Design a protein with these regions (language model features):
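Mid-domain catalytic core of redox enzymes
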Residues: 1-50
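Flavin-binding catalytic cores
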Residues: 5-6, 33, 51, 74-110
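Short glycine/proline-enriched loop/turn "hinge" motifs that connect secondary-structure elements
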Residues: 46-53, 134-140
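Extended, polar/charged low-complexity intrinsically disordered and coiled-coil segments in eukaryotic
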Residues: 55-58
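Short connector loops/turns at beta-strand edges and beta->alpha or beta->beta junctions
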Residues: 61-65
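Glycine- and acidic
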Residues: 66-74, 146-151
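A glycine-rich dinucleotide-binding beta-alpha-beta segment and adjacent secondary-structure elements
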Residues: 92-154
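A conserved FAD-binding loop/helix module that cradles the flavin
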Residues: 149-175
Length: 178
């Protein structure tokens, strides 16, 4: 989360970054991956707030086996490393972002497993079956929108959040006649 009263430029809603010279599924899931997605939430996603606020979520692929047996000390160090590496990557997009951060935390497969009891800390569920149906609803029934984990090219809790933000913006534009 960013500090009250600060702002950032509009750099897009979803930003995919990687230092990898080429696509590699091994690199994407490596414990030290440089690949991440930033989801940027702007004040216009919550227009009724008295104080405009910004929030940024960094998403990184992870394997349960890399996290499950870490000691508490190593686990804490690895989470701190993820946070720092994410801020460094974000600074390439928003150079002064570090000074604007108010709250920073990391969730891992262990976090997901602890709170959801999903096997091996899995955060994703279904695949893309619902994307076309979901995105075409307003074409068939103006004003009818769907948000959920099957409505975007990612699923589970992260897909639900991201698709919810995208859908909320579409609804806002519909209601405002834009």
């Amino acid at each position: 989360g960013l500090k009250k009263g600060v702002s950032i430029p509009d750099v897009g809603d979803l930003i995919f970054t990687s230092e990898s010279p080429s696509f590699s599924t091994d690199e994407l899931t490596d414990f030290h991956t440089t690949s991440r997605t930033f989801s940027v939430y702007y004040p216009d996603t919550r227009p009724d707030r008295k104080e405009p606020r910004y929030s940024i979520v960094a998403s990184i692929n992870a394997k349960w086996q890399d996290w499950q047996k870490l000691s508490d000390e190593d686990y804490s160090k690895a989470k701190n490393r993820l946070c720092e590496e994410s801020v460094v990557a974000l600074e390439k997009i928003i150079p002064d972002i570090r000074d604007k951060i108010d709250h920073l935390e990391a969730a891992t497969p262990r976090t997901i497993q602890h709170y959801t009891h999903h096997a091996s800390g899995a955060s994703f569920g279904t695949k893309f079956e619902g994307l076309d149906v979901s995105s075409q609803l307003p074409d068939h029934a103006p004003g009818l929108y769907h948000a959920g984990s099957v409505g975007i090219i990612m699923s589970g809790w992260l897909g639900t959040i991201n698709y919810g933000v995208i859908t909320a913006n579409k609804i806002d534009r519909f209601l405002r006649g834009k």
